[in-house]
Every structure is written in C-alpha cells, then in structure tokens.
C-alpha cells in the first residue's frame, strides 16, 4: 500500500459531472481496483475547478490507467471533465 496525493484540474462547470461519476456504482467499482475507498480523504477547491484526494493505493498501474484515459470506463468521463492531473507520492517523515 502506498499513500498518494492526486490533484485533478477540471474544466469549467465540470465538477458536478465529475463527482456524479466518482460517486456512481461504476466509478466506485473502478476506484476499488486501485484504492481503499474507505481511507480516501477528498477535498475540493472553492471554485470547484480542482479536486484533490489523499489515497491509499494498492495497484499503481490501475490508478494510472484510471487517470490517463487508458481505462475504457473512465476515459469518456475524463475526456469531458478533466484538464489535467498530477500524482504525488507521500512519504512519512519523523
């Protein structure tokens, strides 16, 4: 398991469609393929143009496929709503 931070930049007015997919049965099934959804910590920018989430990832390749458009379930949604995304690996420090 790896802690990751994902930042998604959304197109203008796309937030509701993005969240509709992420909370749909299809979106949850796809997310469960790479992340423990019960441990996700989401946040939204005040203008709703950016979404970020701290994730506990168990399949990094599936996460990349979900975000980069190579997953056939998420690709149609991302084509409509996403401008860009960034992924950060989180490390604990003492």
Short names for language-model regions:
Residues 1-73, 84-94:
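Short S/T/G/P-rich N-terminal loop/turn motif that feeds into the first structured element of a domain
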């Amino acid at each position: 398991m790896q802690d990751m931070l994902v930042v998604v930049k959304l197109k203008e007015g796309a937030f509701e469609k993005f969240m509709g997919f992420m909370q749909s049965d299809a979106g949850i099934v796809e997310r469960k393929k790479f992340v423990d959804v019960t441990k996700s910590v989401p946040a939204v920018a005040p203008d709703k143009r950016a979404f970020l989430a701290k994730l506990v990832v168990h399949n990094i390749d599936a996460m990349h496929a979900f975000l980069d458009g190579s997953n056939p379930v998420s690709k149609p949604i991302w084509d409509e709503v996403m401008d860009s995304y960034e992924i950060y690996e989180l490390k604990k420090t003492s």
